[in-house]
């Protein structure tokens, strides 16, 4: 059979990356080196498995498959259908729910779009939702807005009213939430967080939602791996809808899932007539064709693999150690007289206040980056600026994946404390007329012997732990 293109074209499409595009290949190798030689503490990050990488880089990405299994708008989808159905089955199994009571959409491309797809499925424009206030640990996609500006697009399409934590305890103020919900009458009550370290009282949230006739939507993006492993309580007993990303504690590819109830929603108190859930059709329609075209089939394939791994004893072992390591973070920071928001953690991360140390999260984040520690500045209750907030968020999943244990996390706290001391010292050395964040960063760029020594020490230490690639 003749090949009707040039030999150079054949080489173009068959050469490996290192030969075809050395520039991109070099950047990827540099990123692998950074991950291998860094302490990665960003709570929303993890390190996925070699098998998941294998599934991601396959010809499954070639196929267009608008629609759903058995109802596609293109031909040639018989194996794509098999894969999506397998992924859905594994999703239900991983979270210990059955297909008679729950369904799941695995096509959503990421967490924020998944949340928007649920809102659009269940609400008309300018209907109301309530979510946790962003500086109190909520997420942008739960309708965040300030007094002067709608930040999240969700708050432009729908009306949002936040609930908050008790400023004294750092715990969600359920009593005030209930009072406000009775007045506000939201269509959807969102129980989900991005920087809240305590367990949510799903039973109480369910009672509040029922009292005002709202859907209870749980966004478990951060904790879905812990839920799947059964090491923290599951929201599925109480929720109407559950959304999650797939790349955080679940340790899969970058994607999202939307779980929705099936069956009887309620029974009319007078007539005894059953009121059925009507979530599956509207949510599926909102995902496609409402917000997306063809799904990313390579991601769905990799997600199926991650979900299989999430049902193993080894995955539970991993999640148990995540919780232990997070507790070490809590204990060791307290020993050094740091204040933790909500006074600690029940999950995979801690939120550390730096106000009492005379420095902010942006400056500590920058120094940490210079010594090969990746964490993130984070708003804490009472903050006015998300760019220069009063805290840092520190998560255990990624370094636990690499095999670090409790003694290692105690050592990590020591490194972070030294970074805080360096940041405070540099900030105090700046003149009043030039002490803004850009001035601080410029001073850090000048370098110190201590920063260089710490960077080399961490670079060498982290090399001892395997990085799946």
From Swiss-Prot:
<comment type="subunit">
    <text>Homotetramer.</text>
</comment>
<feature type="modified residue" description="N6-(pyridoxal phosphate)lysine">
    <location>
        <position position="248"/>
    </location>
</feature>
<dbReference type="InterPro" id="IPR001085">
    <property type="entry name" value="Ser_HO-MeTrfase"/>
</dbReference>
<dbReference type="GO" id="GO:0004372">
    <property type="term" value="F:glycine hydroxymethyltransferase activity"/>
</dbReference>
<comment type="function">
    <text>Interconversion of serine and glycine.</text>
</comment>
<dbReference type="InterPro" id="IPR019798">
    <property type="entry name" value="Ser_HO-MeTrfase_PLP_BS"/>
</dbReference>
<dbReference type="GO" id="GO:0005737">
    <property type="term" value="C:cytoplasm"/>
</dbReference>
<dbReference type="GO" id="GO:0019264">
    <property type="term" value="P:glycine biosynthetic process from serine"/>
</dbReference>
<dbReference type="InterPro" id="IPR049943">
    <property type="entry name" value="Ser_HO-MeTrfase-like"/>
</dbReference>
<dbReference type="GO" id="GO:0030170">
    <property type="term" value="F:pyridoxal phosphate binding"/>
</dbReference>
<comment type="similarity">
    <text>Belongs to the SHMT family.</text>
</comment>
<keyword id="KW-0808">Transferase</keyword>
<keyword id="KW-0663">Pyridoxal phosphate</keyword>
<dbReference type="GO" id="GO:0046653">
    <property type="term" value="P:tetrahydrofolate metabolic process"/>
</dbReference>
<dbReference type="InterPro" id="IPR015422">
    <property type="entry name" value="PyrdxlP-dep_Trfase_small"/>
</dbReference>
<dbReference type="GO" id="GO:0035999">
    <property type="term" value="P:tetrahydrofolate interconversion"/>
</dbReference>
<dbReference type="InterPro" id="IPR015421">
    <property type="entry name" value="PyrdxlP-dep_Trfase_major"/>
</dbReference>
<dbReference type="GO" id="GO:0005739">
    <property type="term" value="C:mitochondrion"/>
</dbReference>
<keyword id="KW-0963">Cytoplasm</keyword>
<protein>
    <recommendedName>
        <fullName>Serine hydroxymethyltransferase, cytosolic</fullName>
        <ecNumber>2.1.2.1</ecNumber>
    </recommendedName>
</protein>
<dbReference type="InterPro" id="IPR039429">
    <property type="entry name" value="SHMT-like_dom"/>
</dbReference>
<comment type="pathway">
    <text>One-carbon metabolism; tetrahydrofolate interconversion.</text>
</comment>
<keyword id="KW-0554">One-carbon metabolism</keyword>
<dbReference type="InterPro" id="IPR015424">
    <property type="entry name" value="PyrdxlP-dep_Trfase"/>
</dbReference>
<dbReference type="Pfam" id="PF00464">
    <property type="entry name" value="SHMT"/>
</dbReference>
